[in-house]
Amino acid sequence: IDDKTHGYRAEENGENIGECIFSLGGIYAEILSVKTRGGDRLVAEGLVRSALNFAANRSAYMARADVGRVEKEPFVTLGFEEKNGFYESDIPSALTGSCGHCVK
């Protein structure tokens, strides 16, 4: 989108079924929006994972998303914690997998 804002789109049979917009700044990545057709949790998780991987490959270590701008899922599934109005996590922990994160 520009040099600090990026996005991923998920398509199925040529139809847009989801998108994730995120920005990078130093060691931080901020997920600005995640939208999916019908609130598909798996597509949302895949898009966020893609964004986090992209960010990590560009030296980002921490990620966050504004609680007021995104749905709770997939952030809780990926192990993000809610702090001061944001879902926050270090990227390596979020990318370790959703197994076990959703049950604490």
Briefly describe each language-model feature range:
Residues E12, S33-V34, V67:
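Residue-level recognition of conserved beta-strand positions in structured domain cores
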Residues G25-G39, S89:
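Conserved acetyl-CoA binding element of GNAT-fold acetyltransferases
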Residues G39-A56:
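Conserved acetyl-CoA-binding loop-helix of GNAT-fold acetyltransferases
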Residues A55-G68:
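Conserved GNAT acetyl-CoA-binding A-motif
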Residues E81-C99:
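Conserved catalytic-core motifs of GNAT/GCN5-like acyltransferases
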